[in-house]
């Protein structure tokens, strides 16, 4: 169920009336759902642009159309239009399921490691154009990783591995006892910091 505040409905209605298109509504969809970069998208929806499988939410003077593929990701979402302390107004969408839900402890060790890598570690590495991929997780809890992007060949990869990736995985995933790097860093084409770097 998606909750829309009265102030958000009034805001949407004002925008729709400004467009002056009969039957126009608002379409809500999830962009890149289940990933760290997931976001909610709101846009005007002319009746002729609708696919036909959207879920309809009657908002009184207009309809909110929810893309059918986005329904599960947007379940429990709240849309509000609030006045900030500064006096400015802002549309706020809270969609707690849009980025996916953290796996429970009953998930396998591999699933939990992959979830933390994709949802916590890779978003941080992306700021340097890097990423890491899980190559293997042994039954004993040793994780074998391969760095890519700006991390492939980076002079700080060892520090990133020990102080960032390994520390995070060991704190967040019960059962991980060590993390190893399987990357051949000598083949890195565009490292964030060259391995020849000396401060």
Curated annotation (Swiss-Prot):
SUPFAM superfamilies: Fe-S cluster assembly (FSCA) domain-like, HesB-like domain
One matching Pfam family: NifU
GO biological process, one term: protein maturation
Protein name: Fe/S biogenesis protein NfuA
Residues that, per the record, bind [4Fe-4S] cluster: 151, 154
Gene3D superfamilies reported in the protein's UniProt record: Fe-S cluster assembly (FSCA), HesB-like domain
Requisite cofactors: [4Fe-4S] cluster
Cofactor annotation comment: Binds 1 [4Fe-4S] cluster per subunit. The cluster is presumably bound at the interface of two monomers.
Keywords noted in UniProt: 4Fe-4S, Iron, Iron-sulfur, Metal-binding
SUBUNIT field: Homodimer.
This protein's encoding gene: nfuA
Function: Involved in iron-sulfur cluster biogenesis. Binds a 4Fe-4S cluster, can transfer this cluster to apoproteins, and thereby intervenes in the maturation of Fe/S proteins. Could also act as a scaffold/chaperone for damaged Fe/S proteins.
Gene Ontology MF: a single term: iron ion binding
Family of the protein in this entry: Belongs to the NfuA family.
């Amino acid at each position: 169920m998606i909750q829309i505040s009265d102030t958000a409905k009034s805001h949407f209605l004002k925008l729709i009336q400004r467009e002056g298109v009969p039957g126009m509504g608002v379409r809500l969809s999830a962009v890149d759902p289940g990933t760290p970069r997931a976001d909610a998208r709101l846009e005007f929806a002319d009746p002729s642009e609708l696919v036909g499988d959207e879920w309809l939410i009657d908002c009184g003077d207009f309809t909110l159309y929810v893309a059918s593929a986005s329904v599960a990701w947007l379940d429990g979402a709240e849309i509000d239009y609030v006045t900030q302390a500064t006096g400015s107004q802002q549309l706020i969408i809270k969609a707690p399921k849009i980025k996916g839900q953290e796996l429970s402890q009953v998930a396998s060790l591999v699933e939990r490691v992959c979830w933390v890598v994709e949802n916590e570690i890779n978003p941080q590495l992306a700021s340097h154009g890097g990423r890491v991929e899980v190559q293997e997780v042994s039954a004993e809890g040793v994780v074998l990783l391969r760095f890519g992007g700006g991390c492939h060949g980076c002079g700080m990869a060892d520090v990133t591995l020990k102080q960032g990736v390994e520390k995070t995985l060991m704190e967040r995933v019960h059962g991980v006892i060590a993390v190893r790097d399987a990357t051949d860093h000598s083949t890195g084409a565009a490292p964030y910091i060259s391995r020849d770097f000396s401060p």
